Amino acid sequence: VTVVRSIGLIVRPRAISGHLTAATRTGIMPLFGGYKASKLKPQLKMAVTRFQIAENKKSALMKQQIRDIARLLAEDPPKEEKARIRAEGLIRDDYMVEAYEILQLSCELLSERIQLITHVKECPPDLVESISTIIWASAIVDIPELIEIRKQFRYKFGKTFEEEAMMNVGGVINERVAVKLSVQPPSAYLVQTYLEKIADEHE
């Protein structure tokens, strides 16, 4: 026992050490926040709405992109190089919409399982992929609610769980989402396939 005489405080090193060890192990400092189902569920529902809005905007943009590509291919001579560049952008948006759809379904699932999430200490095995994918995607997609969702899962399951999700340790991320949100450009074959399909549909 150490007595800090200036303020009359008795410090018990063992108790403090145990408290800090628990906080370090989970990556949670209770003084600054903690898991709250009342915060997580509304954020999941808001994310679902945000994904739906983003999907609709992307879909409308893609329709315009398709018309622009068709016009470039119909010119005499066809402006194939410009059309090819536009097609890459179209493919990226197409991939993004597909990833959004999967992430939206994941948020809906987690919202329905909020009671289970709240009452367990470890992440349920059948939710590891959905939760890890949401955490991983929070740093990539422009859906602000995912930041708070990621924070709540860090409070609930610990910083190690969050870090493993961010690094995709053990391949926990949904493979389709990982592919669709990859920074790698689409293959030349895929771009050509899109161009041919657009040309056929706008003859």
Which residue stretches match the model-derived regions?
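Extreme N-terminal basic, low-complexity initiation segments
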Residues: 2-6
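Extended, charge-rich alpha-helical scaffolding segments
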Residues: 8-173, 177-180, 185-193, 197, ...
